[in-house]
Amino acid sequence: MKFTFHKVTLKKRFPLAISRGVRYNSENLFVCYEKDGHIGWGEAAPGNSEGAATAEAVQEALENFIATGIEGFSIQELYDRAREMKIPPCAYVALDTAFWDWTAKKAQLPLRQLLGFSKPHTPTSVTIGINPPEVIKERVPLLLEGTTVQSLKIKLGSPEGIDADKTMFEQVVESTKKYPVKLRVDANGGWDVNQAQHMMQWLADRKVDYIEQPLKEGDEAGLKTLFKSRPLPIYVDESCRFSQNIPSFAAHVDGVNMKLMKCGGITEALRIIGTARAHGLKTMIGCMSESSVAIAAAAAMTGGIDHIDLDSHYNLAPDPAHGAPLINGVTLPPEIPGHGAYLKEEFYA
């Protein structure tokens, strides 16, 4: 058994601005797990809100975990032990996805088939961040021209208020007239209840598909108020980190958005899917600042998920990994054993 770590800076084509700030690049940690002639790849995207802010912190956490002894345990047992040890989810995800990739390769199956999912078929959204109208006008064609993108997710919740949100949204509508895309909105918790009630009706009148995380994480009382008279489906993102979070808000939302970096990997994502379904909720899977390695791992589950938002690797210049192309609007890893992605050798550190 051998673990190799590679630290890589991911540079974005376009900065991504949301209600909480702007990201220009990220320094991710890639893990290569080798055993019995097979290799598994995993990726961690550190974040201040996720418990490990740097690639160095991620590597230290993983090395400490590995040093406790991991031979002879199942993937699920190792995940549960990592949670007990309080290993940051955005760190442990690299091991979890590497273990699943390795297991699928050993079984000679595509990961999605090992997990019991059909081939991905639902188109992914591509995201545009908070920007002034003149930037939106320039950026929309750069995101959509010559692509097979079918849905655009618009980040709102501007620090400048809902008037700025409306101005930006109207420019998006104008700039997308020549492209056959559906529009979705993610406020990243940037509104209070009154703003959310107003904006949801305003957006519903403009044929938006759904609204994601209208209120701050933890505002279950506000969600209850919104849900009673919602004109749009409500999905929560920041409010849903683990499967055990779901019962607290299940009666007041229409669906949940899971992310591997939030929950710690495929192992917990499967539990989130099952728990959401048990509560009659729809599912979405999203991403953070990730390359094709983490995206391909997430895409292995998309045959059983309602909405897909796996696009961060399309905003990299360049993507240091290979394996999650956009085909007819769908993020579609190759049908080969494992999740299908790997770090390119020129990015080995």
UniProtKB/Swiss-Prot annotation:
GO terms for biological process: amino acid catabolic process; peptide metabolic process. Mg(2+) binds at D186, E212, D237. It comes from the Bacteria. The keyword Hydrolase does not apply. SMART domains: MR_MLE (SM00922). Its EC number is 5.1.1.-. GO terms for molecular function: magnesium ion binding; racemase and epimerase activity; racemase and epimerase activity, acting on amino acids and derivatives. Substrate binds at T127, K153, I154, K155, K259, D309, L310, D311. The keyword ATP-binding does not apply. Binds 1 Mg(2+) ion per subunit. Belongs to the mandelate racemase/muconate lactonizing enzyme family. Catalyzes the epimerization a variety of hydrophobic dipeptides. Epimerase activity is highest with L-Ala-L-Tyr, and lower with L-Ala-L-Met, L-Ala-L-Phe, L-Tyr-L-Ala, L-Tyr-L-Met and L-Tyr-L-Trp (in vitro). Part of a large, functionally divergent protein family. Protein modeling and substrate docking was used to predict the substrate specificity, prior to biochemical analysis. This is Hydrophobic dipeptide epimerase. It comes from Flavobacteria bacterium (strain MS024-2A).
